[in-house]
Amino acid sequence: MNHCFTPSMPYRRTPAVQARLDAQRASVVEAALGLLAEQGYAGCTMAAVATRAGIATGSVYRHFPSKAELAVELFRTVVGREVAAVSEAAGHPGHGSAAERVVAVIETFAQRALKSPRLAYALLAEPVDPAVDAERLVFRRAFRDVFAARVAEGVRTGELPPQDPALTASALVGAGAEALVGPLAEGAVGPDTVPALVTFTLRALGVPDADHA
Protein backbone atom coordinates (compact mmCIF):
# COMPACT_ATOMS: atom_id res chain seq x y z
CA MET A 1 0.00 0.00 0.00
CA ASN A 2 1.30 3.35 -0.96
CA HIS A 3 1.19 6.04 1.68
CA CYS A 4 1.27 9.67 0.77
CA PHE A 5 2.92 11.89 3.34
CA THR A 6 2.40 15.62 3.35
CA PRO A 7 5.47 17.37 4.70
CA SER A 8 4.67 19.54 7.68
CA MET A 9 4.93 23.25 7.13
CA PRO A 10 7.27 25.17 9.46
CA TYR A 11 5.46 27.36 11.95
CA ARG A 12 5.54 31.00 11.08
CA ARG A 13 4.50 33.68 13.51
CA THR A 14 1.85 36.01 12.26
CA PRO A 15 2.67 39.73 12.25
CA ALA A 16 0.27 40.22 15.15
CA VAL A 17 1.98 37.55 17.26
CA GLN A 18 5.42 38.92 16.43
CA ALA A 19 4.29 42.42 17.34
CA ARG A 20 3.07 41.20 20.73
CA LEU A 21 6.36 39.40 21.38
CA ASP A 22 8.36 42.46 20.35
CA ALA A 23 6.27 44.65 22.65
CA GLN A 24 6.74 42.22 25.52
CA ARG A 25 10.49 42.10 24.95
CA ALA A 26 10.64 45.88 24.97
CA SER A 27 8.70 45.97 28.24
CA VAL A 28 11.15 43.48 29.75
CA VAL A 29 14.10 45.65 28.75
CA GLU A 30 12.49 48.81 30.12
CA ALA A 31 11.61 47.08 33.39
CA ALA A 32 15.16 45.80 33.70
CA LEU A 33 16.60 49.23 32.95
CA GLY A 34 14.51 50.69 35.76
CA LEU A 35 15.81 48.09 38.20
CA LEU A 36 19.35 48.60 36.96
CA ALA A 37 19.15 52.33 37.63
CA GLU A 38 17.76 51.72 41.12
CA GLN A 39 19.65 48.66 42.33
CA GLY A 40 22.40 47.88 39.87
CA TYR A 41 22.99 44.50 38.27
CA ALA A 42 22.73 42.72 41.62
CA GLY A 43 19.10 43.70 42.01
CA CYS A 44 18.22 43.01 38.40
CA THR A 45 17.14 39.38 38.86
CA MET A 46 14.93 37.62 36.36
CA ALA A 47 12.16 37.32 38.95
CA ALA A 48 12.37 41.01 39.83
CA VAL A 49 12.28 41.98 36.17
CA ALA A 50 9.23 39.78 35.61
CA THR A 51 7.43 41.39 38.54
CA ARG A 52 8.27 44.89 37.34
CA ALA A 53 7.12 44.04 33.80
CA GLY A 54 3.95 42.35 35.06
CA ILE A 55 4.63 39.01 33.40
CA ALA A 56 5.65 35.50 34.45
CA THR A 57 9.32 34.79 35.04
CA GLY A 58 9.17 32.16 32.29
CA SER A 59 8.20 34.87 29.82
CA VAL A 60 11.38 36.77 30.63
CA TYR A 61 13.41 33.63 29.91
CA ARG A 62 11.62 33.30 26.58
CA HIS A 63 13.30 36.50 25.45
CA PHE A 64 16.55 36.17 27.42
CA PRO A 65 17.61 32.60 28.26
CA SER A 66 19.96 33.81 31.01
CA LYS A 67 20.57 36.82 33.23
CA ALA A 68 23.90 37.30 31.46
CA GLU A 69 22.16 37.73 28.10
CA LEU A 70 19.72 40.21 29.62
CA ALA A 71 22.61 42.11 31.22
CA VAL A 72 24.42 42.36 27.89
CA GLU A 73 21.27 43.71 26.24
CA LEU A 74 20.89 46.30 28.99
CA PHE A 75 24.51 47.33 28.70
CA ARG A 76 24.26 47.76 24.94
CA THR A 77 21.07 49.78 25.30
CA VAL A 78 22.53 52.13 27.90
CA VAL A 79 25.84 52.50 26.08
CA GLY A 80 24.03 53.32 22.85
CA ARG A 81 22.17 56.13 24.58
CA GLU A 82 25.29 57.48 26.28
CA VAL A 83 27.42 57.44 23.13
CA ALA A 84 24.63 59.20 21.22
CA ALA A 85 24.42 61.86 23.93
CA VAL A 86 28.14 62.65 23.99
CA SER A 87 28.38 62.55 20.19
CA GLU A 88 25.60 65.12 19.94
CA ALA A 89 27.20 67.27 22.63
CA ALA A 90 30.54 67.19 20.81
CA GLY A 91 28.95 68.64 17.71
CA HIS A 92 30.71 68.80 14.37
CA PRO A 93 33.93 70.39 13.12
CA GLY A 94 33.42 74.14 12.91
CA HIS A 95 31.07 74.23 15.90
CA GLY A 96 33.36 75.59 18.61
CA SER A 97 37.05 74.88 19.02
CA ALA A 98 38.42 71.35 19.08
CA ALA A 99 39.17 71.70 22.79
CA GLU A 100 35.61 72.85 23.47
CA ARG A 101 34.21 69.85 21.64
CA VAL A 102 36.40 67.45 23.62
CA VAL A 103 35.42 69.17 26.86
CA ALA A 104 31.77 68.84 25.87
CA VAL A 105 32.23 65.07 25.71
CA ILE A 106 33.70 64.75 29.20
CA GLU A 107 31.24 67.24 30.70
CA THR A 108 28.24 65.50 29.18
CA PHE A 109 29.40 62.06 30.26
CA ALA A 110 30.17 63.20 33.82
CA GLN A 111 26.97 65.20 34.25
CA ARG A 112 24.82 62.33 33.00
CA ALA A 113 26.65 59.99 35.37
CA LEU A 114 25.96 62.27 38.32
CA LYS A 115 22.26 62.40 37.47
CA SER A 116 22.02 58.57 37.53
CA PRO A 117 24.85 57.49 39.85
CA ARG A 118 23.68 53.91 40.39
CA LEU A 119 23.28 53.35 36.68
CA ALA A 120 26.64 54.96 35.95
CA TYR A 121 28.39 52.77 38.51
CA ALA A 122 26.79 49.68 36.97
CA LEU A 123 27.98 50.84 33.58
CA LEU A 124 31.53 51.57 34.66
CA ALA A 125 32.58 49.16 37.35
CA GLU A 126 30.01 46.96 39.08
CA PRO A 127 31.26 43.33 39.18
CA VAL A 128 29.16 41.34 36.73
CA ASP A 129 29.24 38.46 34.28
CA PRO A 130 32.33 38.17 32.00
CA ALA A 131 30.06 38.79 29.02
CA VAL A 132 29.31 42.26 30.35
CA ASP A 133 32.98 42.89 31.05
CA ALA A 134 33.59 42.21 27.36
CA GLU A 135 30.92 44.76 26.49
CA ARG A 136 32.68 47.29 28.72
CA LEU A 137 35.66 47.12 26.39
CA VAL A 138 33.36 47.90 23.46
CA PHE A 139 31.91 50.79 25.46
CA ARG A 140 35.34 52.25 26.17
CA ARG A 141 36.33 51.96 22.52
CA ALA A 142 33.14 53.74 21.45
CA PHE A 143 33.85 56.65 23.78
CA ARG A 144 37.50 56.65 22.75
CA ASP A 145 36.48 56.99 19.12
CA VAL A 146 34.28 60.02 19.92
CA PHE A 147 37.19 61.69 21.71
CA ALA A 148 39.75 60.68 19.10
CA ALA A 149 37.78 62.16 16.21
CA ARG A 150 37.67 65.57 17.91
CA VAL A 151 41.32 65.43 18.95
CA ALA A 152 42.39 64.44 15.43
CA GLU A 153 40.44 67.34 13.96
CA GLY A 154 42.12 69.73 16.39
CA VAL A 155 45.57 68.44 15.49
CA ARG A 156 44.77 68.65 11.78
CA THR A 157 43.66 72.29 12.03
CA GLY A 158 46.49 73.29 14.34
CA GLU A 159 44.13 74.06 17.24
CA LEU A 160 45.83 71.35 19.30
CA PRO A 161 49.54 70.45 19.45
CA PRO A 162 50.73 67.32 17.63
CA GLN A 163 49.78 64.14 19.49
CA ASP A 164 48.44 60.64 18.97
CA PRO A 165 44.65 61.15 18.99
CA ALA A 166 43.87 57.53 19.86
CA LEU A 167 46.33 57.52 22.76
CA THR A 168 45.06 60.83 24.14
CA ALA A 169 41.47 59.65 23.75
CA SER A 170 42.16 56.36 25.55
CA ALA A 171 43.82 58.24 28.41
CA LEU A 172 40.86 60.61 28.73
CA VAL A 173 38.34 57.76 28.80
CA GLY A 174 40.33 55.90 31.42
CA ALA A 175 40.92 58.95 33.58
CA GLY A 176 37.32 60.10 33.38
CA ALA A 177 35.94 56.70 34.33
CA GLU A 178 38.43 56.19 37.16
CA ALA A 179 37.78 59.66 38.55
CA LEU A 180 34.06 58.95 38.77
CA VAL A 181 33.98 55.32 39.95
CA GLY A 182 35.00 55.92 43.55
CA PRO A 183 32.71 58.89 44.20
CA LEU A 184 29.80 57.16 42.44
CA ALA A 185 30.22 54.02 44.55
CA GLU A 186 30.38 56.07 47.74
CA GLY A 187 27.64 58.50 46.74
CA ALA A 188 29.99 61.38 47.46
CA VAL A 189 30.57 63.31 44.24
CA GLY A 190 31.65 66.83 45.13
CA PRO A 191 30.78 70.00 43.20
CA ASP A 192 34.38 70.36 42.03
CA THR A 193 34.52 66.97 40.31
CA VAL A 194 33.37 68.05 36.85
CA PRO A 195 35.38 71.32 36.76
CA ALA A 196 38.47 69.37 37.83
CA LEU A 197 37.88 66.86 35.04
CA VAL A 198 37.58 69.71 32.55
CA THR A 199 40.87 71.23 33.71
CA PHE A 200 42.57 67.84 33.50
CA THR A 201 41.19 67.31 29.99
CA LEU A 202 42.49 70.66 28.77
CA ARG A 203 45.93 69.93 30.22
CA ALA A 204 45.98 66.50 28.62
CA LEU A 205 45.17 68.09 25.27
CA GLY A 206 48.04 70.54 25.66
CA VAL A 207 45.81 73.61 25.70
CA PRO A 208 47.77 76.70 26.86
CA ASP A 209 46.61 78.28 30.12
CA ALA A 210 44.34 75.32 30.87
CA ASP A 211 43.95 76.51 34.45
CA HIS A 212 42.25 79.65 33.20
CA ALA A 213 40.29 78.20 30.25
Language model regions located:
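Short linear capping/connector segments at secondary-structure termini
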Residues: 87-90, 123-131
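Helix-turn-helix
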Residues: 27, 35-69, 73
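Amphipathic alpha-helical packing segments from all-alpha helical-bundle domains
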Residues: 80-84, 111-115, 131-156, 166-170, ...
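Hydrophobic alpha-helical connector segments
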Residues: 73, 84-115, 168-172, 194-198
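Generic hydrophobic, amphipathic alpha-helix propensity
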Residues: 21-32, 49, 74-78, 82, ...
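N-terminal intrinsically disordered/low-complexity leader segments
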Residues: 1-23, 211-213
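Short coil/turn segments at alpha/beta junctions that flank glycine-rich nucleotide-binding fingerprints
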Residues: 38-42, 116, 157
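Hydrophobic/aromatic-rich alpha-helical bundle segments in the mid-to-C-terminal region
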Residues: 121-125, 155-200, 210-213
